[in-house]
Design a protein with these regions (language model features):
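N-terminal Rossmann-like NAD(P)+-binding domain of SDR-like oxidoreductases, especially those catalyzing
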Residues: 1-63, 192-198, 202, 206, ...
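A short C-terminal helix-loop "cap" of Rossmann-like NAD(P)-dependent dehydrogenase/epimerase domains
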Residues: 51-54, 78-89, 115, 143-155, ...
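C-terminal "lid/loop" region of Rossmann-like NAD(P)-dependent oxidoreductases
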Residues: 92, 121-123, 132-137, 145-166, ...
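Hydrophobic alpha-helix immediately C-terminal to the catalytic Tyr-X-X-X-Lys motif of short-chain
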Residues: 39, 43, 47, 77, ...
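Hydrophobic "lid"/C-terminal helical patch
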Residues: 77, 81, 106-113, 137-140, ...
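Glycine/proline-rich active-site loop of Rossmann-fold NAD(P)-dependent oxidoreductases
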Residues: 38, 63-76, 83-86, 102-103, ...
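Substrate-binding strand-loop-helix patch
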Residues: 66-71, 94-106, 122-142, 183-185, ...
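Generic structural signal for alpha-helix termini and adjacent loop/cap motifs
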Residues: 50, 80-84, 112-116, 177, ...
Length: 213
C-alpha cells in the first residue's frame, strides 16, 4: 500500500511541559518555523480524516550526522574546532536535546512506511534521552581538542520566548507499532560525524568563522 509520510518536527512541542514528550503533548508554536509545521501537520491530518488519504505524520527529534547544515549546533561546534579555534562560540548551552543519528532517523521513516499500523498516526522518532547543549559541546571538545573552551556569543542566542528549553522525546509508540530501534549511540554517531567532517574535501564546504542563521 502506498502511504504519504509527512515530515514534522519535535519543535512543534515547544519547551517540554512534561517528559518524555509523547505524541499527545500540546503543540506550542514558539517560532515561525514550528508554527508553520503545526499548520502543515493539521492539514495533513485533515486529508486523512476527510479523504481517507493514507497519511502518517513522522516527528523526528534532533537529527545529526555527516553533511548536516552549518546552521545546526553539532556542525557549528565541529567546524570551529577543526578550524583550530580554541574559543568555541555558541548561544545558550543549558537547553536539552534528544539527538538521533541520521541513519536511525532514516530507518525510522522506512519502518513507519512498512508498518500497517501507522496510517493516521503521529509518530515520534526519538531516543528517549536528553543532553544539554553544553555537555554535548564538551563531548565534542574532548574528542577534538580538550584545551578548547565554550564562550557565549550573544548573536547566537534565540529570543527568550522562542528558545525551546527542553526536548526529550518518548519513543514508546514507534517501538510498539514498528520494528524500529536505535542502532547508533550518541557517542558512536559523534565519532562518525567528526570523521566525516575531518576529511578536507568535506570540511572545505563549511566556513567556521561565519555564523549561519
Amino acid at each position: 500500500m502506498e502511504k504519504v509520510l509527512v515530515t514534522s518536527t519535535s519543535e512543534v512541542y515547544g519547551t517540554a511541559l512534561y517528559v518524555p514528550i509523547d505524541e499527545k503533548h500540546p503543540r506550542q508554536g514558539q517560532s515561525p518555523y514550528s508554527a508553520t509545521k503545526i499548520g502543515a501537520d493539521a492539514i495533513a491530518d485533515s486529508f486523512y480524516r476527510s479523504f481517507n488519504l493514507p497519511v502518517t505524520i513522522v516527528r523526528p527529534f534532533n537529527t545529526f550526522g555527516p553533511r548536516q547544515s552549518a546552521r545546526a549546533v553539532i556542525p557549528t561546534i565541529i567546524t570551529q574546532l577543526l578550524a583550530g579555534k580554541t574559543e568555541i562560540k555558541l548561544g545558550a548551552i543549558h537547553p536539552t536535546r534528544d539527538l538521533l543519528f541520521v541513519k536511525d532517523t532514516a530507518n525510522g521513516f522506512v519502518e513507519i512506511a512498512k508498518s500497517d499500523k501507522t496510517i493516521g498516526e503521529e509518530i515520534n522518532i526519538a531516543t528517549s534521552s536528553e543532553i544539554t547543549v553544553g555537555d554535548l559541546a564538551q563531548k565534542i571538545i574532548n574528542i577534538i581538542n580538550p584545551l578548547a573552551k565554550i564562550i557565549t556569543d550573544d548573536i547566537r542566542l534565540r529570543p527568550e520566548k522562542s528558545e525551546v528549553e527542553r526536548l526529550f522525546g518518548s519513543n514508546k509508540k514507534i517501538l510498539e507499532i514498528t520494528n524500529w530501534k536505535q542502532n547508533v549511540s550518541l557517542d558512536e554517531g559523534l565519532k562518525l560525524t567528526i570523521d566525516w567532517f575531518s576529511k578536507p574535501e568535506n570540511l572545505q564546504r563549511y566556513k567556521a568563522e561565519i555564523y549561519n542563521v
